Amino acid sequence: MADEALFLLLHNEMVSGVYKSAEQGEVENGRCVTKLESMGFRVGQGLIERFTKDTARFKDELDIMKFICKDFWTTVFKKQIDNLRTNHQGIYVLQDNKFRLLIQLSAGKQYLEHASKYLAFTCGLIRGGLSNLGIKSIVTAEVSSMPACKFQVMIQKL
């Protein structure tokens, strides 16, 4: 339980630190989401390397996405993804109905615009993990009602 609280506090401090540096002119305001996503990318690469060192090879893309939704998500966020959908053409939608990093935000409509700040790191986390498993992707997130969110993963064919 303590490690979960530390992760949530660290994540909140990363977000506020990046946005404070933008206010002080150290970083362009438009680059904040990119910076958070880059941090998540590097963390995702490292975590996947550690989590998969003792697992068998994945047989296909869908197997990798199932690993991300079950094992990876459970380790990082203490629960599995609630729903995984695919069109079998390289697009996957991961839905989390109680996303841990959004739970501390108020559920009012006025806070929806701030949600993207708190999702950028996780988009990078997913993209970094997939990258280390040999899958190049674009990951976006959307929130229609708090604290539920959907991550869309578009696989880039080489």
From Swiss-Prot:
Protein localization: Golgi apparatus, cis-Golgi network; Endoplasmic reticulum
Q: Enumerate the Gene Ontology biological process terms.
A: endoplasmic reticulum to Golgi vesicle-mediated transport; nervous system development; vesicle coating; vesicle tethering
Primary residence: Golgi
Q: In which tissues is it expressed?
A: Widely expressed. Expressed in lung, heart, liver, spleen, brain and kidney.
Q: Which Pfam families match?
A: TRAPP
Is Zinc-finger a UniProt keyword of this protein? no
Per the record, its GO cellular-component terms are:
cytoplasm; endoplasmic reticulum; TRAPPII protein complex
Q: Which domain of life is it from?
A: Eukaryota
The entry's keywords: Endoplasmic reticulum, Golgi apparatus, Neurogenesis
Subunit structure, briefly?
Homodimer. Part of a TRAPP complex. Heterodimer with TRAPPC3. The heterodimer TRAPPC6B-TRAPPC3 interacts with TRAPPC1 likely providing a core for TRAPP complex formation.
Cross-referenced PANTHER family, in alphabetical order?
A: TRAFFICKING PROTEIN PARTICLE COMPLEX SUBUNIT 6B
> What does the record give as the function of this protein?
Component of a transport protein particle (TRAPP) complex that may function in specific stages of inter-organelle traffic. Specifically involved in the early development of neural circuitry, likely by controlling the frequency and amplitude of intracellular calcium transients implicated in the regulation of neuron differentiation and survival.
Family, per the entry? Belongs to the TRAPP small subunits family. BET3 subfamily.
The entry's protein name is Trafficking protein particle complex subunit 6B
Q: Tell me what organism the protein belongs to.
A: Mus musculus (Mouse)
Q: Gene name?
A: Trappc6b
